[in-house]
Regions:
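C-terminal edge-of-domain segments
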Residues: 4, 117-118, 122-170
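Short, structured beta-strand-loop surface elements
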Residues: 63-122, 142
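Conserved hydrophobic/aromatic beta-strand scaffold that supports enzyme active sites
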Residues: 22, 42-46, 97-99, 137-139, ...
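An N-terminal domain-cap segment
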Residues: 1-71
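Surface loops and adjacent helix of pleckstrin homology
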Residues: 26, 61, 81, 150-152
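Short glycine-enriched loop/turn motifs at secondary-structure junctions
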Residues: 51-53, 96, 131
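General beta-strand recognition
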Residues: 55-57, 77, 146
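Generic structural signal for secondary-structure transition and capping sites
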Residues: 19-20, 75, 124, 145
Length: 170
């Protein structure tokens, strides 16, 4: 039986307590005007964890610019933060940024079915949205991250740390 560090326990508690994340994507490239640097795109997304395929699941509209950007540039980042507490400073607010690779499983595939099951287990109220033609599941495979447990308590985490934190039964 292995001992889980306090930082790993803290990461697990943070991830399991948050249902939304800020999703950052590379903007669509403007190959005509290469001198103009497009700003990164950020959106708030509900997310779920697929423990079978070790992916974070989001459900997004294909009409959204961030979805189109993910299709062109699958490298993404997610940021989850602890909830602010009245009277406490925000500089030591616990947070984790996760870098990953986004992919859209074909509708009806085993990955799609797993994504749908995991997402609806966490967000059953989203079931009607799964029938909308422009919405799709996106699987984000975690690659690495940065966990800030508090002021002066920051560390890099690898994919295995993230997977272990997201799998409470592991």
């Amino acid at each position: 039986m292995s001992h889980e560090s306090r930082l790993q326990q803290s990461l697990r508690q943070l991830l399991l307590s948050q249902r939304t994340a800020a999703l950052a994507v590379q903007p669509l490239a403007d190959f005509i005007n290469v001198s103009a640097l497009p700003a990164p795109q950020i959106s708030m997304v509900p997310w779920a964890w697929d423990a079978e395929f070790f992916t974070l699941i989001i459900h997004v509209s294909g009409l959204a610019s961030h979805t189109q950007a993910m299709e062109q540039h699958p490298a993404v980042s997610l940021l989850m933060t602890a909830t602010e507490q009245t009277g406490q400073g925000v500089h030591a607010l616990e947070r984790v940024s996760i870098q990953g690779v986004a992919s859209t499983p074909p509708e009806g595939s085993v990955l799609w079915q797993g994504a749908r099951k995991a997402y609806l287990a966490r967000f059953p109220e989203a079931e009607p949205m799964t029938a909308l033609g422009d919405f799709r599941f996106v699987c984000i495979t975690p690659q690495s991250g940065r966990h800030v447990a508090g002021f002066g308590a920051a560390r890099d985490v690898d994919a295995q740390d993230l997977i272990a934190a997201l799998n409470p039964a592991a």
